[in-house]
Structures are given as structure tokens and as C-alpha cells.
């Protein structure tokens, strides 16, 4: 696997990969799935970071944080210098609906893992709040994580339906985010699915929703 990674880096080019934002693990499967060799993943991540290629990991799992080799890898003042770890970002999918994910770690366990990475290991972290299963639940997730996440990525539930969310709750939610983000270090990423959801609402509210979403995005320009 390491040889394949090295060959792919040479074939594509390190500069091209960096310009594209680095390597992302992974939308299609969980990189810390119990069936995956987490030690091999750690070595691949090291190879990428050693070449100054940013690495972003998205997972639902938390058990890998108890793996001794991963703990050594993340610990400050170990064989992995801080200047490598600055290019590492780790996020957790947190929707707040444990009943929809009976085989995954609970919301609280994921939040605790996020806190450990952010506060103890000083790793850049993010929350993938996608999909929003309910406005209330999404609001609670944000309240519990915005101080321990460097970013929160927000997306509407698929498929997009006009009656998916109450339009007044949806509007109140995005206005609250707009007002919150101005004073936070945590960056909020509004996914395109939020715009698609806003476009399903009727009347003048549609344009008000889109205007607020635009305001949030412009904060980070």
C-alpha cells in the first residue's frame, strides 16, 4: 500500500495534490472502519505529511484513539514533529441522532474524541453536521462542539424536499449561525445542499434564506 501511495504521488505530482487541498479520507467509506488496518493508515498519513501534503480524515469511529501507535503518533514531542501534524485535520460526522446509527459510537463519545484531539493533542478538528436530521438537534450539536472544532460543515438532508424542514425554523437556524460566527474562531462551511433546500421554499422567504447563506459564506472570503 505504501508503494502504491508513493507511485501515485509521483504520478500526480506533490504540488498538484497540495493545490487541490491535499488528501481526504474519505466520503465513500470510514477510514477507521474496524475491518481496515489502522496501522497501515497511520503509515500512509505519515508519508503524506512528511511530503507536506495536507491530510483530512473524516470518521465516525473513536476506538482508534486508544491504539498505542496512533496515540504515540499524535502525542506532542514524539517521533512525529509538530510541523508535520499542523497539516493534519481530523473530523467526525456528528448528526446527533444515535438511533439512526445503531452500530456507530454515540454522539457523546464522538464529541469526547473531538475534544481530546482538539484540547490534548492540539490537532485541527472539524464536525461534519451532514445531514441535518432536525433543526433542534443540529443546534444542540453546534452548541456542544463549536468550542472544540476549528470548523463545522453543515449540509441539508438528501433528497432535498420542500417539506423536509419547517421554513421558519430553518430561517431561524441560519440567522443564528450568521450571528454566531462573527465572534468565533470556528469556521462554518455552508454546503451547496443548504442552498438547494432554501430554493424549495416559496415566496420572498426563499431570497431571504439565500441572502443569509451568502452572508455566512462571505464572512470567510
Annotate the PLM regions.
Residues 164-221:
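C-terminal accessory extensions appended to soluble enzyme cores
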Residues 2-180:
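Conserved AdoMet/S-adenosylmethionine-binding subsite of the radical SAM
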